[in-house]
Design a protein with these regions (language model features):
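Short acidic, glycine-rich surface-loop motifs adjacent to enzyme active sites
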Residues: 218-237
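A short C-terminal boundary segment appended to hydrolase-like catalytic domains
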Residues: 303-355
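N-terminal active-site segment of His-dependent metallophosphoesterases
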Residues: 54-113, 117, 205, 236
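Active-site-proximal beta-strand elements of phosphoester/diester hydrolases
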Residues: 62-75, 186-196, 226-230, 290-296
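C-terminal motif of bacterial Sec signal peptides marking the signal peptidase cleavage site
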Residues: 25-28
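Extended active-site neighborhood of metal-dependent phosphoesterases/phosphodiesterases
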Residues: 109-221, 240-250, 255, 261, ...
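Short, low-complexity, disordered segments immediately C-terminal to signal peptides
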Residues: 30-55
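Bacterial N-terminal signal peptides that target proteins for export
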Residues: 2-16
């Protein structure tokens, strides 16, 4: 059985599009200092603030997520395009949450392009979306945040969609360089901004410290961990991109706390790694190590591979689609790639970690 098919008898919590959206509230502001443990938080750059939050859904429940990045081509408004079919397929599957993995609108996510193009095909998904930003297409510098910040807050001129689930839960806009995290059932989700390594290394280093504190607190609460960031570290090379070595400090922290899986995009193809350590060594499914998914098949042009790292165990570059994940209370998870244009797919289960 694969993602979105088995639920181990658990009753899945409905996604309420309120401040809590069934997952707990978050706070967002600029600040400094070491945060107290909290179920959820959002920060600007690398400085973290926290606030009390309520229950984040039963820890006995399986959580159903969809994930994809690299979505809409310049000028496209067609619901029957590849990206339109991906969006429709996600909505038909009725996930509780959609993780947007960055690069939403090409070539540049300005307010006008997002409203006039992106929202025509992805607007109905926005209320379900938690999101991270990709550098260049979503923002180009620390002073280039308006399109991303305003669109996901639902405040671009002429916008009739949004705000996103993430912004709605926070009651405040979220910028492309912001950190966010939250508990979802037995799991803890984190969103990072790889653009900071290009645009403001000081903030990227601060975010590394924030990540370390956040994962330590989540681990102490007994949570299983998922981290999303746009530019992948564990990936094959294409004619445009190779592994993003700048994010290695984050990979070290991810390895330190035995994060179960990461989600990235950017490469315009699909990949899955073995459970892998920061040293590039594969480990058993029930051991430590992170399963790294690259899901950048949301509708923009696909790219072939020019090498094959030994840790990549499944990949293809000929099929548009999205990844379904079922995160179970014992730390196991199922995945299934849903093809919508093309026929390649991937599915499986990683069992619960050994105690």
């Amino acid at each position: 059985m694969t993602a979105f098919q088995r639920h181990r008898g658990a009753t899945l919590p409905a996604l309420a599009l309120t401040a809590a959206i069934g997952l707990g509230a978050v706070s967002a502001c600029s600040g400094s200092g070491t945060p107290a443990p909290t179920t959820s938080t959002s920060t600007s750059g690398g400085s973290q603030s926290s606030s009390p939050s309520g229950p984040t859904g039963s820890t006995a429940s399986t959580v159903r997520l969809a994930a994809v990045g690299d979505m809409n081509n310049d000028g496209n408004t067609s619901p029957t395009s590849a990206t339109g079919e991906v969006a429709s397929s996600i909505l038909a599957a009725n996930p509780e949450l959609v993780l947007g993995l960055g690069d939403y609108q090409y070539p540049k996510g300005t307010c006008s392009a997002l409203v006039e193009d992106y929202d025509k095909v992805w607007g109905k998904v926005l209320p379900l979306m938690f999101h991270i930003a990709g550098p260049n297409h979503d923002w180009n510098s620390t002073s280039d945040e308006e399109g991303y910040r305003r669109h996901f807050a639902g405040t671009c001129p002429g916008q009739t969609t949004g705000p996103s689930a993430l912004v709605r839960s926070e009651h405040t806009p979220v910028g492309p360089g912001d950190f966010w995290s939250r508990d979802v059932g037995a799991w803890h989700l984190v969103g990072l901004s790889t653009g900071l390594w290009r645009f403001d290394q000081g903030k990227a280093e601060a975010m590394t410290r924030t990540l370390d504190r956040d994962l330590a607190a989540a681990k102490a609460r007994g949570k299983y961990l998922l981290v999303a960031y746009h530019d992948p570290y564990f990936t094959s090379t294409t004619d445009q991109h190779g592994p993003d070595k700048a994010v290695k400090p984050w990979v070290d922290v991810i390895d330190k706390y035995d994060v179960r899986l990461t989600l990235s995009a950017s490469q315009h193809n699909y990949e899955r790694s073995c459970p892998i350590l920061e040293s590039d060594a594969c480990t058993p499914d029930t051991g430590p190590g992170t399963t790294a998914f690259n899901v950048s098949t949301g509708g923009v042009n696909l790219r072939s591979f020019v090498n094959k790292p030994p840790y990549i165990v499944k990949r293809f570059s000929d099929t548009y689609g999205w990844l379904a994940l079922s995160l179970h209370p014992d730390g196991s998870f199922d995945w299934r790639y849903h093809p919508v244009v093309g026929s390649s797919t991937d599915s499986g289960t990683r069992p619960a970690p050994r105690e």
